[in-house]
Amino acid sequence: MTTDINDRALLLLGTLSLSDLAVTNSKEYVRWQNIKRGSARIAATEIEELGRIFPNYRYWLISGEIMPKAGQTSPSYDEANEKLAGPNAG
């Protein structure tokens, strides 16, 4: 289970390409690249940006908790629900 906000942010960041986040070779692109490679720490502004990109994961990203009835889930919750809804479930 991912418990640290930085770990949760990096998990979401891993699902994106750098071009999803910024224009190639821009200052922001290099910043995201450094974060992804582990040579820079993620800051509040990047956490906010990930929250805008993944609005359904916003609460989980900040708190580590989910509220499915409010549409606030996590990647692992969504993955488990997809498997349950699949044709070979159960």
List each language-model region with its residue ranges.
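A short, Lys/Arg-rich alpha-helix, primarily the initiator
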Residues: 1-24, 59, 88-89
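Short, conserved clusters of charged catalytic residues that mark active-site
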Residues: 4, 42-45
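A short, basic/aromatic helix-end/turn motif that makes direct DNA contacts
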Residues: 24-27, 55
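Recognition helix of helix-turn-helix/homeodomain-like DNA-binding domains
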Residues: 26-42
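DNA major-groove recognition helix of helix-turn-helix/homeodomain DNA-binding modules
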Residues: 45-60
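Short, charged recognition helix plus adjacent turn
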Residues: 59-90
